Structures are given as C-alpha cells and as structure tokens.
C-alpha cells in the first residue's frame, strides 16, 4: 500500500451514482449502508452518515467504500481507509488504499498477488 491518488479516486467516483459504506459493529458484524461520498482535499467525506455508521467507526476506525459497477464486466471502485466519526454531520475517511477491481478475463498466475483485474489508484 502506498499513497492514494485522491484526485484519481474522485475522478473515477464521479462515474458512479452511489457507494456502499462498510463498517464493523462493536460486536464484530459487518454493517453496510448506501452513501454519496464527497471529496475534500485528501479526505473522503460521507455527509449524513447514520448514527450506526458513526458509532461503528468510533469502535473500529477501519472502513471501506465500494462503488459497484454499472454492469458485471465493469470495475468496482474500492477505497479502504481510517474513519473519524466525531462530527455528527459527516463521517470523514482518510484513504489508505484505493483500487479499481473486476474479475479477470483470464486468471493470473498463482502467487502473483491479485489474480483479478486490479488497478491501484
């Protein structure tokens, strides 16, 4: 994992209508909600994040955003990051990794890391 090109992430995210915010509850369960992230500087902001999402982020700051593709051959945009849920109006996420991901047309060689079609941003 290196530095995330937030400008590239914002550019790609503009082609999607919404994202899924994935958080972990204090009881170690996955919670998913539909969100409309915005990009401010080097931070991804999720305005109007639910109380549950903010509570989860306070307990487990590691979160993911997934923008699904319009069709099954398209790329999903996946952003992992560290969330700050202190603001009641929005969840702020510092991205730590971002990729475009889709199933590979042909599987890659075993042991080659991601055997899918992945593009680091």
Model-identified regions with their sequence ranges:
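Short capping/connector residues at structural and topological boundaries
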Residues: 35, 103-105, 120
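Charged phosphate-binding loop/patch that engages nucleotide di/tri-phosphates or the phosphate backbone
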Residues: 113-121
């Amino acid at each position: 994992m290196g530095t995330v090109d937030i400008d590239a992430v914002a550019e790609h995210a503009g082609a999607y209508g919404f994202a899924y915010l994935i958080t972990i509850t204090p009881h170690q369960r996955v919670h998913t909600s539909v969100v409309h992230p915005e990009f401010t500087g080097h931070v991804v902001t999720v305005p109007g994040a639910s109380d549950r999402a903010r509570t989860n982020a306070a307990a487990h700051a590691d979160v993911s955003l997934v923008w699904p593709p319009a069709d099954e051959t398209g790329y999903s945009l996946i952003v992992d990051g560290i969330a700050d849920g202190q603001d009641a109006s929005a969840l702020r996420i510092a991205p730590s990794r971002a990729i475009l991901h889709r199933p590979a047309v042909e599987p890659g060689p075993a042991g080659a890391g991601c055997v899918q079609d992945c593009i680091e941003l």
